[in-house]
Amino acid sequence: MRKNKKNTKISFLIRTRNEERWIGHAIQSVLDRVYRPEILIVDNNSTDNTLRIVKYFQHDPLLNELDHPSGKNYTDIRILNIKNYTPGAAINYGVKKASNEIIVIMSAHCILKKINLKKHIKDLNNNVCIFGNQIPIWEGKKLTKRYIWSHFTNTRVQNMFSKLENRYFIHNGIAIYKKKILKKYPFDKYLLGKEDRYWAAKIIKKKLNFLYDPSLEAEHHYTDGGSTWRIQGKV
């Protein structure tokens, strides 16, 4: 499996609360496609095995990769605990702590399938966000893309407008930003959901652009607590 080049510095930001079922799969999918990224886990008081599983992937600084090739399956992972959680507050906190300029926000129950950092970073020169295709998965079954999932087509779209929601549409299931943009235009920390849509509206008012690119792709797995799934039918 081809990975992105070693000299690309990137931080993944993953928000968690009791994500033991998928968090290991999510992290492994990142390591399979991106060389030694920084991964920031912004955790909202998980009470299951989420954080124990995360620690399986933490890089041991004493590990010599030349002597232990399996070290490629580890990376720099930091666990950040947040009080008074909201989606926007968690992202803003992770951005503040991120070491790298390129930031990927990914759901804890998404599996990264495709990413071309060279291409996406180039697109960030003309767009403040690149968000990607999501394939809805329920109990292993790929679902027909209805309701919110119908936005995730096979065509690139700049400044996507949702007729379903009657507003501009970005989805942080898998999305790439520059740190300096997110520091200048942080997410609304008071919103309990849809922080990405409100952010899109703010960006449009600033006469900036964002891009949907299906060549950035993730499988989005069903969870009982998943906000994207709560208002959707499973079939």
Report the location of each language-model feature.
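Short aromatic/hydrophobic "clamp" motif used to bind/position activated sugar donors
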Residues: 103
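Acidic donor-binding loop at a coil-to-helix junction in glycosyltransferase catalytic cores
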Residues: 192-199
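A conserved acidic beta->alpha catalytic loop
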Residues: 29, 43-52, 110
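Glycine-rich, basic loop-to-helix element that forms the pyrophosphate-binding segment
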Residues: 69, 82-98, 119
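Conserved donor NDP-sugar-binding/catalytic core segment of glycosyltransferases
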Residues: 115-144
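Active-site donor/metal-binding and catalytic loop motifs
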Residues: 206-231
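A recurrent flexible, glycine/aromatic-enriched loop bordering the glycosyltransferase active site
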Residues: 157-177, 192
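Short, acidic, metal-binding catalytic loop of nucleotide-sugar glycosyltransferases
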Residues: 28-37
